[in-house]
């Protein structure tokens, strides 16, 4: 069984809340701050933050104060490949990569929903993100059995 996450921006706390789909029935919601979009380097993972949550299929970095490596890596990679062709990047997001303005929560939410989650689900490009996590993330997954996919259809 693979983990499947949905995300919501909490504008009051300026954090990206992540939780497994169907967490309400299991009583296991969790949230964590997203951190910087353009930083591809994984940060240290807090040993106690979220340690009580054992969510199948999630890497340990899902509970990091900087957010999951999957989102950080994916965001950074997307920006790096499109920053020179900024017509493909929303204007506020392009400015954010240059440090010129603050991105609104609406634009950030649209970016994640449209660019990262919706397109990959509908177009069947989940393998790209799976490889990014398993190949690019230095953190071990919570579950040992393979395959453990971070964002995949169950």
Swiss-Prot record:
Localization: Host cytoplasm; Host nucleus; Host mitochondrion
The keyword Ribonucleoprotein is annotated on this UniProt entry: no
One example of a Gene Ontology biological process annotation: symbiont-mediated arrest of host cell cycle during G2/M transition
One GO term describing the cellular component: host cell nucleus
Keyword line: Activation of host NF-kappa-B by virus, Activator, Apoptosis, Host cytoplasm, Host G2/M cell cycle arrest by virus, Host mitochondrion, Host nucleus, Host-virus interaction, Modulation of host cell cycle by virus, Transcription, Transcription regulation
Main location: host cell
Region annotated Mitochondrial targeting sequence, chain positions: 68-117
Modifications after synthesis and translation: A fraction may be phosphorylated in insect cells and HepG2 cells, a human hepatoblastoma cell line. Phosphorylated in vitro by host protein kinase C or mitogen-activated protein kinase. N-acetylated in insect cells.
Signal peptide coordinates: none
Function: Multifunctional protein that plays a role in silencing host antiviral defenses and promoting viral transcription. Does not seem to be essential for HBV infection. May be directly involved in development of cirrhosis and liver cancer (hepatocellular carcinoma). Most of cytosolic activities involve modulation of cytosolic calcium. The effect on apoptosis is controversial depending on the cell types in which the studies have been conducted. May induce apoptosis by localizing in mitochondria and causing loss of mitochondrial membrane potential.
Family designation: Belongs to the orthohepadnavirus protein X family.
Oligomeric and partner information: May form homodimer. May interact with host CEBPA, CFLAR, CREB1, DDB1, E4F1, HBXIP, HSPD1/HSP60, NFKBIA, POLR2E and SMAD4. Interacts with host SMC5-SMC6 complex and induces its degradation. Interacts with host TRPC4AP; leading to prevent ubiquitination of TRPC4AP. Interacts with host PLSCR1; this interaction promotes ubiquitination and degradation of HBx and impairs HBx-mediated cell proliferation.
Protein name stated in the entry: Protein X
Species this protein is from: Hepatitis B virus genotype D (isolate Germany/1-91/1991)
């Amino acid at each position: 069984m693979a983990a499947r996450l949905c995300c919501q921006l909490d504008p009051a706390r300026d954090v990206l809340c992540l939780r497994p789909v169907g967490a309400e029935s299991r009583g296991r919601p969790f949230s964590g701050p997203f951190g910087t979009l353009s930083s591809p380097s994984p940060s240290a993972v807090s040993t106690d933050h979220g340690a009580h949550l054992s969510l199948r299929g999630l890497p340990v970095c899902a509970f990091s104060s900087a957010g999951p490596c999957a989102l950080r890596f994916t965001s950074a990679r997307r920006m790096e490949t499109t920053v020179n062709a900024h017509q493909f990047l929303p204007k506020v997001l392009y400015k954010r990569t240059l440090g010129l303005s603050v991105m609104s929560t609406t634009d950030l939410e649209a970016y994640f929903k449209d660019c990262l989650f919706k397109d990959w689900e509908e177009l069947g490009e989940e393998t790209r993100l799976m490889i990014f996590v398993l190949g690019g993330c230095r953190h071990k997954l919570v579950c040992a059995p393979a395959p453990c996919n971070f964002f995949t259809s169950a």
